[in-house]
Amino acid sequence: MTIEERHEIEIKYCELKWIINSLQTQLTQMERDKRNLEKAIAGAYFQDIKLALEQSYVKKCQEVDEVRQLKIDYTNKLLKIHDEYLKATED
């Protein structure tokens, strides 16, 4: 492996690491929002408000699942690149 190829893999690795960290930050905030919606639903007095909050909650849960899946996908890519790098440096 040339120095340029190794450098390219290191850049990809760093970019993926940054994406994963950003997704984790986003996921943490979304989980917090989800918990706040749960509390709002529990405290809602009027049925129409409760229904609207429940719809928001369902949407938020879907968004959380999507971001979580993205994080998994990027983590898998990161692991593949890490394995490639390790194999290349062993040669």
Describe each region flagged by the PLM:
Residues 1-31:
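Short, charge/polar-rich alpha-helical segments
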Residues 25-61:
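Short E/K-rich amphipathic alpha-helical oligomerization segments
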Residues 43-47, 78, 91:
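Compositionally biased non-globular segments, especially hydrophobic aliphatic-rich helices
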Residues 2, 6, 34, 44-46, ...:
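Functionally constrained cores in energy, signaling, and assembly domains
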Residues 3, 80-91:
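Short acidic DE-rich linear segments
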Residues 20-27, 56-84:
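Amphipathic alpha-helical coiled-coil segments
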